[in-house]
Amino acid sequence: MKFTKIAVACGLALAALSAQAVPVTIPAGTQVVFLSGASAPDNFLADLATSMLTNVTAIRSSDSATTPLHRAFLGQAAAGIPGVAVGTPILFIKRSQGGSVFGVDPVARAARIQTIDFNNCTATTGAFAFSCATTGIDPGIAGHESASNTGLVPDFGISDVEPALFAEPFNTENGQPAL
């Protein structure tokens, strides 16, 4: 009898875990804004998102238990954003992995880079509603140039390093040539 109870308990625990694996629902017509680069703004991104968006859902990558290398905020545009209608669905994505060089090179080269996989997430508690895997291939890694690369091209970047310092063999992503 004890064995049966243990088996049932284990089965229920595993079923509960798989039930939490869900995609993040991104509404049709959502405007995506993708920022990559230095981690300097990471500490105030949540404040920025909640000041510009309503009904904000915070999302993180599952790459680190403490400080995510990718984060995103999904919500609707609040009043007061010039040129954006109130209620427009917006997904703001920030990639910090790789630091400043990923705020310069992929933007200048229009290169796809790894980002959050919104179809491979787990519901969480705390500051982030979802923890997600990543998708895509960074420049300089085999398969990056493939049409099947699911990474995204950043819309803009941030760097706290002088872009002129991104020269071979230092400060380039995965051995890419200097700009």
Show which residues each predicted segment covers.
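Bacterial N-terminal signal peptides that target proteins for export
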Residues: 1-8
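Repetitive helical segments and hydrophobic/amphipathic motifs
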Residues: 11-14
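N-terminal signal peptide c-region/cleavage motif recognized by signal peptidases
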Residues: 16-18
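N-terminal segment of the mature folded domain
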Residues: 22-179
